[in-house]
């Protein structure tokens, strides 16, 4: 009888139970169901402020748009200097 490899040997160690038995396949083990929106998916704390801003009931205090770049004005300054 020839010697064969044991069928019980595994090539690598199995994942710990923390990773293999919690959550759905492909999710991180510390994944929060519904991204923390709560029971019934009512939303996260602070979501109502976005709704009020979108409806125009309050001014956009928390939703400041990013300030535009001054790149175009600088290009014009450099062009004027180089042309002279």
UniProtKB/Swiss-Prot annotation:
Keywords annotated in UniProt: Cytoplasm, Mitochondrion, Phosphoprotein
One biological process term in Gene Ontology: cellular response to desiccation
Region feature Disordered, mapped onto this chain: 1-84
GO cellular component: cytoplasm; mitochondrion
Biased composition (Basic and acidic residues): 1-18, 74-84
Chief localization: mitochondrion
Function, in words: Found to stabilize, together with STF1, a complex of intrinsic ATPase inhibitor INH1 and proton-translocating ATPase (F(1)F(0)-ATPase) in mitochondrial membranes. Binds to the F0 part and may function to hold the ATPase inhibitor or STF1 on the F1 subunit. Also acts as a hydrophilins that enhances dry stress tolerance. Cell viability after desiccation and rehydration is due to the antioxidant capacity of the protein, which reduces the number of apoptotic cells during stress conditions by minimising the accumulation of reactive oxygen species (ROS) in the cells.
Extra facts: Present with 5330 molecules/cell in log phase SD medium.
Family note: Belongs to the STF2 family.
Protein name: ATPase-stabilizing factor 15 kDa protein
Organism encoding this protein: Saccharomyces cerevisiae (strain ATCC 204508 / S288c) (Baker's yeast)
């Amino acid at each position: 009888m020839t010697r064969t490899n044991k069928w019980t040997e595994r090539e690598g160690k199995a994942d710990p139970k923390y990773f293999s038995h919690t959550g759905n396949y492909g999710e991180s083990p510390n994944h929060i169901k519904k991204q923390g929106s709560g029971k019934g998916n009512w939303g996260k704390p602070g979501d109502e402020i976005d709704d009020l801003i979108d409806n125009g009931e309050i001014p956009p205090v928390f939703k400041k748009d990013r300030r535009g770049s001054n790149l175009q004005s600088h290009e014009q300054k450099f062009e004027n200097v180089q042309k002279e």
